[in-house]
């Protein structure tokens, strides 16, 4: 009996592109008729098939595993710092897990806060701050079909590949996968090149069509009772456009891979030497004409899905053997750093200097250097970083990590005060404000009065997002001004916003001013804060909002 390539793919749990490559290599029995492969079903290897029965059991939704995985990835690397790094919910997770479990059935979403993340000197991208309950539900729902997606993904795709040890995280290390992507394509261009096209997609996560995405999930045989709440969550977060998925969560990375599967399979099926890491794509050929043909074909395929290639980021060129790349300099500096060699400081400083030469900084290089120079407590670049804070806004978390080592020094405090007071329109980005406030909370002794006044103004502006007001409230509390403390108490007791109440409870605890009647009143109105109250009662000190474990932060600097 003969069957089609899609049917063989379903039976073997592999992608259609993989089936075609196995047919071409003689590893699966079949023949090509009229330019299309047919598969000899009776000669297929006996591998477990993917169940297509209408009555198949619903995949198990594991919200507890989702929280464990999120603590290792998403929650540790949020766009802006949380006042407790969500440790209160991790310590007493029962209520938040129950709420997340309910969302996995209803799809009812909480309000999403958009953080404008600087991208270049003038533009931004929309980072999504989901509630913890929403984030857990989103992750748990998507995790139910992660294995199906993994089986269908081509081995030419390196982004967001499933981790064999699910307790350690949903995906393999993004850093390791990015390095493999670079190493593999660099080897490939030396043997199958020398021409390579490099391109990426414009605002990829923000342009994903929900309609097309759910068509792909249907083809992947995701059950309707998983798709329905997932669809409702995405609608709730993006109700205005029905396009876009949250930037940041691992769940979105999984959906991002699924959305590109059809493009991957078509490019590979047509014989193009194609490689992908999420929205970064490379095509290799032995002539300029051939690589441009492939690029044009990719452009057409992406356009049919509502995606656009970035013209400024599309590069076509010859890559001769032995040519050094930016990644080579990063790898060498990282080798010096990890092995404690004297050359480390000089090499990493050089990377930082080169990242700041142009008006638009090399963000990845700046982030790489700042984290490592912070680990080395390298004072030599301090003055340069303070002078360039306005240009380092894209690397705000890493800048804060570096500055925290010197945050109690009077000279540095004066420089930060001047910077906060200095910019005219449009002023300091909220994203950078949040990370600077987190660094200011690391100060030993009393913060400068100017910082308290600055933070107080932020708390009093109801138009500011709650995450920013909460961070500012914690700095205000350290000033122990009676008027400010009275406002914190009143907010904790009377405010209707549980996020703001949580922030003020933490602020009062930070100042040693949290009293039981205030806690009782807050929890009676916002029962979900019971875990916060228990956490604060059991702690003699609060966690650093920057120091996630310096070595792990060094390990996790993103390559995208």
Q: What are these regions, as identified by a protein language model?
A:
Residues 1-16:
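Polyanion-binding surface elements
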Residues 4-6, 27-51:
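Short helix-start
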Residues 23:
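DNA major-groove recognition helix of helix-turn-helix
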Residues 52-224, 235-249:
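Conserved two-metal-ion catalytic palm core of "right-hand" nucleic acid polymerases
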Residues 172-278, 282-301, 305-308, 313-317, ...:
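Conserved polymerase palm-domain catalytic core
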Residues 323-337:
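Short, low-order "capping/linker" segments at domain edges
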């Amino acid at each position: 009996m003969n069957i089609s390539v899609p049917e063989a793919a379903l039976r073997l749990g592999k992608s259609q592109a993989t089936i075609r490559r196995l047919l071409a290599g003689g590893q699966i029995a079949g023949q090509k008729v009229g330019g299309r492969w047919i598969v000899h079903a009776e000669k297929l290897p006996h591998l477990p098939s993917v169940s297509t029965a209408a009555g198949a059991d619903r995949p198990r939704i594991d919200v507890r595993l989702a929280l464990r995985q999120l603590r290792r990835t998403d929650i540790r690397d949020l766009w802006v710092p949380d006042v407790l790094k969500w440790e209160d919910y991790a310590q007493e997770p029962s209520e938040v897990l129950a709420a997340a479990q309910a969302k996995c059935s209803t799809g009812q979403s909480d309000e999403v806060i958009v953080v404008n993340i600087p991208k270049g000197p003038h533009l931004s991208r929309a980072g999504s701050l989901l509630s913890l309950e929403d984030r857990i539900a989103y992750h748990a729902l998507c995790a139910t079909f992660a294995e199906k997606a993994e089986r269908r993904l081509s081995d030419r795709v390196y982004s967001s590949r499933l981790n064999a040890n699910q307790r350690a995280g949903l995906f393999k290390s993004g850093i390791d996968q990015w390095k493999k992507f670079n190493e593999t394509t660099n080897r490939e261009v030396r043997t199958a090149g020398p021409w390579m096209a490099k391109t990426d997609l414009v605002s990829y996560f923000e342009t994903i069509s929900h309609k097309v995405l759910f068509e792909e999930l249907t083809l992947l045989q995701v059950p309707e009772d998983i798709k329905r709440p997932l669809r409702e969550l995405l609608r709730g977060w993006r109700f205005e456009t029905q396009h876009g998925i949250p930037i940041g969560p691992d769940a979105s990375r999984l959906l991002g891979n699924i959305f590109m599967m059809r493009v991957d399979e078509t490019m590979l099926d047509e014989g193009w030497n194609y490689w992908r890491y999420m929205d970064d794509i490379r095509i290799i050929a032995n002539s300029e004409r051939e690589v441009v043909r492939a690029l044009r074909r990719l452009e057409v395929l992406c356009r049919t899905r509502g995606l656009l290639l970035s013209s400024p980021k599309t590069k076509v060129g010859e890559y001769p053997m032995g040519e050094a790349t930016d990644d080579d300099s990063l790898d060498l500096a990282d080798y010096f750093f990890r092995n404690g060699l004297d050359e480390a400081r000089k090499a990493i400083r050089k990377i930082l200097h080169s990242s700041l030469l142009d008006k638009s900084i090399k963000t990845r290089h700046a982030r790489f250097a700042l984290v490592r120079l912070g680990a080395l407590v390298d004072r030599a670049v301090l003055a340069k970083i303070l002078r360039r804070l306005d240009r380092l806004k894209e690397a705000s978390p890493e800048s804060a990590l570096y500055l925290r080592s010197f945050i109690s020094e009077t000279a540095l405090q004066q420089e930060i005060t001047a910077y906060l007071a200095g910019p005219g329109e449009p002023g300091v980005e909220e994203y950078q404000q949040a990370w600077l406030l987190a660094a200011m909370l690391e100060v030993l002794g009393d913060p400068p009065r100017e910082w308290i006044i600055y933070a107080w103004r932020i708390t009093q502006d109801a138009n500011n997002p709650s995450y920013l007001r909460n961070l500012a409230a914690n700095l205000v509390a350290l000033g122990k001004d009676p008027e400010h403390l009275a406002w914190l108490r009143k907010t904790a007791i009377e405010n209707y916003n549980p996020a703001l109440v949580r922030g003020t409870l933490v602020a009062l605890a930070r100042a040693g001013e949290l009293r039981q009647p205030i806690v009782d009143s807050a929890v009676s109105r916002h029962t979900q804060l019971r875990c916060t109250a228990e956490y604060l009662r059991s702690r003699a000190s609060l966690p650093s909002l920057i120091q996630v474990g310096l070595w792990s932060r060094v390990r996790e600097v993103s390559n995208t």
